[in-house]
Amino acid sequence: THWTAEERHYITSMWDKINVAEIGGESLARMLIVYPWTQKFFSDFGNLTSSSAIMHNVKIQEHGKKVLNSFGSAVKNMDHIKETFADLSKLHCETLHVDPENFKLLGSILIIVLAMHFGKEPTPTWQAAWQKLVSAVAHALTLQYH
């Protein structure tokens, strides 16, 4: 993926402002609520019986933070996203058997959550840069799938 200076700016300047625990936890929780079939991959995370239970589930919050921290690797290695996510792709494909479509869903949710948290800052150009990034990460995470 080729990145323009403007795209890099939109991504890195926003990343520096992100509260990873808050945004990550909220993004993962929202994905599980909006797309309930994704909950099957988190059956050992405790109570997922309601939106409130999911939003306040400590394991979901912690895993969301972990997911967004790993997403930060893409921000730091924008020119090497495929290599950066090779091991995670293998894990999600061979061990966890995650539906690769879920990576796109979570990326879309992340953009929505960022837009909610940062108000008017996310312009259409900002959104285009972030969409390109989440798409690149989702693609990298699917490379081990056949």
Curated annotation (Swiss-Prot):
Q: Name one Pfam family in it.
A: Globin
Gene Ontology CC entries for this record: blood microparticle; haptoglobin-hemoglobin complex; hemoglobin complex
* Domain Globin intervals: 2-146
Tissue spec. comment: Red blood cells.
Q: Which family does it belong to?
A: Belongs to the globin family.
Instruction: Kindly state the subunit structure of this protein.
Output: Heterotetramer of two alpha chains and two beta chains.
Q: Could you identify this protein by its name? A: Hemoglobin subunit beta
What is the organism field in this record? Caretta caretta (Loggerhead sea turtle)
Gene from which this protein is expressed = HBB
